[in-house]
Amino acid sequence: MTTGYRRLHILVEGQSEEIVVNNVLEPYLQNQGWMVTKSIVTTKRPATGPASHGGVSSWTKLKNEIRLLLRSSDIHTLTTLFDFYGFPTDSPGMNDQPSSSPYDRVQHVEKSLTSTISDPRFVPHLILHELETWAFAAAEQLGWLFSGSDLAALLLKDVRDAGGPELVNDGPNTAPSKRLARYCASYSKTNDGPLAIADLGIEGLKAQCPHFADWLAELDSRT
């Protein structure tokens, strides 16, 4: 950890991501020497009235917001917290992904975003495959929240079969969020998921999610 604080801004996809930043990521990042700010991506800027926030509908809108944020010289590093599943198909790198592992594909897209924005302060991060991936990593913790259910066993089986939480696939019926909804109708994305992830903690997430661990390692190298 460094003694001088630098500002890290995290542009997040929605409310659930913001909650996880507040409760899990921010305390860790502050300890690493960052002053953390965050914002939810703007989806609509009307001529009058408040802007709408949450969700990523197109690369053009996201690119404009990233560049708007980078106008601030106060930001040392700008990073993102968006799902790889459902990321806009018009985004750089999405249409020429390599036919290899999910790790290679997401890294290809992130590198393409970096190249397009062309600002050394920009460190894009896409969650493999979505925020609920981290809830899969916290399967045992979710099991404690839903004691008496077989939720933990179902999630752990999926993780074992896939080879890790980040490899639970991203099909429209089999993505982590779809599986959670099917396994547990009362599961709350904005409450239960963040609680379980916080209980698992940063080190638990890093141990199970290599792409997440690589992202934090890159941020740590910049403090």
Model features per residue range: what roles?
Residues 1-5, 18-49, 63-223:
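C-terminal accessory helical subdomains adjacent to catalytic cores in phosphodiester-
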Residues 10-19:
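Catalytic nucleophile-elbow at a beta strand-turn-alpha helix junction centered on a G-D-S/GDSL motif
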